[in-house]
Amino acid sequence: MNAVAPISVRVNPNVDANTHPYISTGLAENKFGVDADVALSMYKKAALSDSLKVCGLDYHIGSQITEIAPFIEALERALELVEKLKSENILVEHLDIGGGVGVSYDDEKIINIEDYLNSVTNRAKEMKILVEPGRSIVANAGIFVTRVEYLKRNNLKSFAIVDGAMNDLIRPSLYESFHQAVLIDDNSIGINDNWDIVGPVCESADFLAKNRNLTLEKGDYIAIMTAGAYGFVLSSNYNSRPRVPEVMISGKQHSLVRKRETIESLFENESLFEDGTNQ
């Protein structure tokens, strides 16, 4: 075929992103990438091959990062490897710095993206820079709307049991992450209390928010904010719950872009085991 395949190597720069450990991907203890010495050896072997062309160096140190320092530390370690490659006459055309820029879920101070990119381009000079933004683009473009089904109070806790659950938005259960919970109609005449907003799934990890001061009554709608990233894509059919629909809004226009699943759709790809007894 005489094809020449372009290659990039994902390097693990061993940098602590100071984020939740489940979404840290740039430490030596994480499963991603190879260390700089291994990468150097890989590049040398690739440079000797007639079927491979070295074109880039990649890294990604994690997600929901709210400080610029880890990004710069990772960049500088990557550029050290680029210089070593130059000394071996191996030229890297692009540097893929991944994504990871965090957003504000709970009034966190976040990175100024312009300052971050200026820091990158000032250091990387004439290299082509690839960036993989995700959360920083879509997180605040989505909200999860859920309805209060029941209010339940005991001597210790007050629960707002809603129709949404951990299968719909698992981030609070998986990462103990914080999402703002906003009452859509702020004229509710219900009960004011500090509510745990919980779903109907059969485990205590099923919560969307805890200890939120709201005035609620049955039938109220609550908006769980900043749900556009790692929301629907992490949803499941746990407890045989059909996934929710998605509605896109633009100005005063709205359109159903993903219809609600049905109980029937949960089983449409299943079939009986054909062992001769169910003929």
Show which residues each predicted segment covers.
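Glycine-rich beta-alpha junction loops
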Residues: V11-V15, I61-I65, G99-V103, R135-I137, ...
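Charged (often Lys/Glu-rich) extended helix/loop segments that serve as interaction or gating elements
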Residues: S119, E126-Q279
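Active-site-proximal beta-alpha core segment in soluble small-molecule metabolic enzymes
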Residues: M1-H94, V103, S119
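Short, glycine- and charge-enriched coil/turn segments that flank and shape catalytic ligand pockets
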Residues: N2-A3, L48, S87-E88, I110, ...
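Short glycine- and Lys/Arg-enriched binding-loop motifs that mark or flank ligand-binding interfaces
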Residues: Y22, E29, L52, D58, ...
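Conserved active-site and cofactor/substrate-binding residues in soluble primary-metabolism enzymes
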Residues: V34-D37, S41, A69, E73-E76, ...
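Short acidic, glycine/serine/threonine-rich loops at helix termini
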Residues: A17-S24, I68-P70, Y105-I110, N140-F144, ...
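Glycine-rich phosphate/ribose-binding loops and adjacent secondary-structure elements
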Residues: R77-L81, E88-D96, V101-I143, E149-Y150
